[in-house]
């Protein structure tokens, strides 16, 4: 499978790396260019035991890649996971879904054929 993980925080990075370790081709997308450079050098922005080694091994095996090019990642993938932040709104009554809505809009502008979006 060709999988796109949008967001390289805890959920996106750990899940994407594990999908790659299972043999899938995974491209992780993030707007933060500095974070992408670090990830391409096997430097994880989060701590999870064994994650650095999994990133390094799967990146070298070309099963895991990192980019800022959301449009290209969407077009090259069969499955797209939206893994962006949903912080609590002021007052703590609900989640701020604005990042999800923004990514959904960007996906709609880039999608070129049927995709599974999670």
PLM regions and their residue ranges:
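Structural/interface elements that position substrates and couple domains in central-metabolism enzymes
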Residues: 1-117
């Amino acid at each position: 499978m060709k999988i796109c993980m949008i967001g390289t925080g805890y959920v996106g990075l750990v899940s994407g790396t594990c999908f790659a370790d299972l043999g899938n081709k995974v491209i992780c997308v993030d707007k933060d260019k500095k974070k992408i450079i670090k990830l391409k050098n096997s430097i994880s922005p989060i701590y999870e035991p064994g994650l650095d080694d999994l990133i390094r091994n799967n990146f070298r095996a070309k099963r895991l890649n990192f980019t800022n090019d959301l449009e290209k990642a969407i077009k090259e993938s069969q499955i797209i996971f939206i893994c962006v932040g949903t912080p609590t709104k002021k007052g703590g009554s609900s989640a701020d879904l604005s990042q999800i809505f923004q990514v959904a809009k960007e996906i709609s502008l880039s999608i070129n054929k049927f995709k599974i979006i999670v």
